[in-house]
Amino acid sequence: MRTPYCVADYLLDRLTDCGADHLFGVPGDYNLQFLDHVIDSPDICWVGCANELNASYAADGYARCKGFAALLTTFGVGELSAMNGIAGSYAEHVPVLHIVGAPGTAAQQRGELLHHTLGDGEFRHFYHMSEPITVAQAVLTEQNACYEIDRVLTTMLRERRPGYLMLPADVAKKAATPPVNALTHKQAHADSACLKAFRDAAENKLAMSKRTALLADFLVLRHGLKHALQKWVKEVPMAHATMLMGKGIFDERQAGFYGTYSGSASTGAVKEAIEGADTVLCVGTRFTDTLTAGFTHQLTPAQTIEVQPHAARVGDVWFTGIPMNQAIETLVELCKQHVHAGLMSSSSGAIPFPQPDGSLTQENFWRTLQTFIRPGDIILADQGTSAFGAIDLRLPADVNFIVQPLWGSIGYTLAAAFGAQTACPNRRVIVLTGDGAAQLTIQELGSMLRDKQHPIILVLNNEGYTVERAIHGAEQRYNDIALWNWTHIPQALSLDPQSECWRVSEAEQLADVLEKVAHHERLSLIEVMLPKADIPPLLGALTKALEACNNA
């Protein structure tokens, strides 16, 4: 045990309890003394980032792979830069703890006009800004620090959302008592009467259903129930699909998997399997505009049984207080009795194998990439042509597929990939990002090179903001960006650039380069030249829906 033991040590021990081995962030004068304890910690490794926005994205990517992450910024200027990323973590249910190093308690009490403040002697402005985008918050004092750290962390673990701790510089050094027990959050259990009522209602519906299908989404992943869903479809063969954020839950090459459900933009086979079912088991779903091609999904309450993290629904009746794992266990048992295999002729397995010739287009790019993906990959696809083109990829077992279509902050994936590779150094990380998106967060390439990471980064260069062009202003210069020499950037961002770069414009070139980088131990950047106006089919349907909504 470290002596003298203080609040900083207590917080670091609790981060370890939550599963974090790293702390992302940017140093600032109000958090430097806390950082001394981080550097001395045997369990937590400091990971400095190029800026706070990137650090928040990196922490998010890390948490999606490890289940929890922590981020450190400095008061005011640092924390505000990170709030975009924290808001995305909140929207998409990712538990990232935001620790903010703040001015000392005495200075705050005196209302001193300090740097990084608004000059009004008030120190809670930014705390209040964080309240809507975190599930629990605390201003730590010498008296409450240990209790509040535990409260915020247990709430985060239960709700799978971010938390916020303001840590004044002096409080970090105050004496604390080491924790006796590891931090755990108690698994909730449903009231027996409520669970029975849900079971009875679900059984009545399933018993009358001739065709039952399963539709899963990202909240299954956030609550650690991926393997439960995989086991479910093995024990009870039935048609199943995911939404975009839930890709990777299933082995997408197995029988019974139909693809990605996206409302009217779904393939005919997926629409028939899901919308044509008498009963659809919707587990961990969120029917957002970008996931449903503008709310074009055709699923009625009467047709669905819905399972959310802390409640379940049959028809129009909600049963609150039922944890997702218990609802799933109940439905698996009922499905074994009442669901019989039907409409099981899928999966097509994969996009047809390409003939690698001709200039690159959206179509032959994704077909070529399909042959490159292998079990265990971590794939991050940025908002836009990357995410919505990847929707038709058929992922093998144990692939992590990371997208951010609800929050939709372009540039997210480059920095999130840094976090993902930090969490999983021995797995292959593949980044799919547009040129416009990459310009927002490219600095984190330097951090990847510093830490000797070796992701495979594909920059889809279509000369600007293609999604925005598809929505509105196809020829307007506000959708243009500066044209960069992408293959030279890694060299500029490291004095020891252990990287290789390529620019490809032909399908055969891409196939050859992918074969070269398949087992590389260095960072690989591939600039993929694509037509300016070429977009994946789903993105075309989505942009039309968004344009109509904006004009309504």
Swiss-Prot record:
Q: How is the cofactor bound?
A: Binds 1 metal ion per subunit.
Cofactor(s) required for function per UniProt: a metal cation; thiamine diphosphate
UniProt binding sites for Mg(2+): D435, N462
> Which biological pathway?
Plant hormone metabolism; auxin biosynthesis
Q: Does the keyword Metal-binding apply?
A: yes
Cross-referenced PROSITE patterns, in alphabetical order? TPP_ENZYMES (PS00187)
The Enzyme Commission number assigned here is: 4.1.1.74
GO BP term (any one) = auxin biosynthetic process
Keyword Metal-binding listed? The answer is yes
Q: Please give the superkingdom of this protein's source.
A: Bacteria
Looking up Gene3D superfamilies in the UniProt record yields:
3.40.50.970, TPP-binding domain
> For the region Thiamine pyrophosphate binding, what residue ranges are annotated?
385-466
Cite the InterPro entries for this sequence: DHS-like_NAD/FAD-binding_dom (IPR029035), IPDC_Enterobacteriaceae (IPR017764), PDC/IPDC-like (IPR012110), THDP-binding (IPR029061), Thiamin_PyroP_enz_cen_dom (IPR012000), Thiamin_PyroP_enz_TPP-bd_dom (IPR012001), TPP-bd_CS (IPR000399), TPP_enzyme_TPP-bd (IPR011766)
Give any Gene Ontology cellular component.
cytosol
> According to its UniProt record, which reaction does this protein catalyse?
indole-3-pyruvate + H(+) = indole-3-acetaldehyde + CO2
Q: Which UniProt keywords apply?
A: Decarboxylase, Lyase, Magnesium, Metal-binding, Thiamine pyrophosphate
Q: Tell me, what's a Pfam family for it?
A: TPP_enzyme_M
Cite a single GO MF annotation: indolepyruvate decarboxylase activity
Signal peptide as annotated in the record: none
**Could you say which residues bind thiamine diphosphate here?**
E52
**Family designation:** Belongs to the TPP enzyme family.
What is the protein's quaternary organization? Homotetramer.
Listed name of the protein: Indole-3-pyruvate decarboxylase
- Gene it is expressed from: ipdC
